Amino acid sequence: MAEKFIKHTGLVVPLDAANVDTDAIIPKQFLQKVTRTGFGAHLFNDWRFLDEKGQQPNPDFVLNFSQYQGASILLARENFGCGSSREHAPWALTDYGFKVVIAPSFADIFYGNSFNNQLLPVKLSDAEVDELFALVKANPGIHFDVDLEAQEVKAGEKTYRFTIDAFRRHCMMNGLDSIGLTLQHDDAIAAYEAKQPAFMR
């Protein structure tokens, strides 16, 4: 069973870029692993580092700024997660420590993959995201409160409403991924299998 997501309060980092694709999130040369761990070290590798080995941090990239170390909420622009359908993108984001991504829109496959990996993608309007960027840039180190149950983001003095479809919301709040959903029907599956002829078992 995955970790339950009900509420999260976290430090916000502003990635002021639109159309951030999955190759930027986790470059293809790091996709050889078959487990979900270890990808955070290579998140935004070509932007975070000046060298190919990932040993020389780029001082101009926002994730390297001291005030954003330990950030768990990523604020981004439209069409986040576009490009190829690699599930490694949400793996890298969660392994780095992100719990929430806020943007005006997401690529469809990335959006679905995020829920499967307990990464909450929050859609707000362009105007609301503009407000949040201004707020974060004026208050480096600010924390947002994200409440999935109430479907609200509290930022500064304002509250922003978002909508998640009921099924995905239920799964995240109960820590259910695809395997967890299947295991809810373990008894029924076992009963069905027991009725099968021996040659089919």
UniProtKB/Swiss-Prot annotation:
Q: Which residues form a coiled coil?
A: none
Keywords per UniProt: Amino-acid biosynthesis, Branched-chain amino acid biosynthesis, Leucine biosynthesis, Lyase
Note whether Amino-acid biosynthesis occurs among the keywords.
yes
Full protein name: 3-isopropylmalate dehydratase small subunit
Q: What is this enzyme's catalytic activity, as reactions? A: (2R,3S)-3-isopropylmalate = (2S)-2-isopropylmalate
Q: Which GO terms describe its biological process?
A: L-leucine biosynthetic process
Which E.C. number(s) belong to this protein? 4.2.1.33
Q: Which CDD domains match?
A: IPMI_Swivel
Spell out the Gene3D superfamilies in the cross-references.
Answer: Aconitase, domain 4
> Which family does the similarity line name?
Belongs to the LeuD family. LeuD type 1 subfamily.
Q: What GO annotations for molecular function exist for this entry?
A: 3-isopropylmalate dehydratase activity
- What's one Pfam family here? Aconitase_C
Please give an example of a GO cellular component term from this record: 3-isopropylmalate dehydratase complex
Q: Which organism is it from?
A: Escherichia coli O157:H7
| Pathway as given in its UniProt record | Amino-acid biosynthesis; L-leucine biosynthesis; L-leucine from 3-methyl-2-oxobutanoate: step 2/4
- At the top of the EC hierarchy, this enzyme's class is lyase
Record note on quaternary structure: Heterodimer of LeuC and LeuD.
Q: Which InterPro entries match?
A: 3-IsopropMal_deHydase_ssu, Aconitase/3IPM_dehydase_swvl, AconitaseA/IPMdHydase_ssu_swvl, IPMI_Swivel, LeuD
| Function, as annotated | Catalyzes the isomerization between 2-isopropylmalate and 3-isopropylmalate, via the formation of 2-isopropylmaleate.
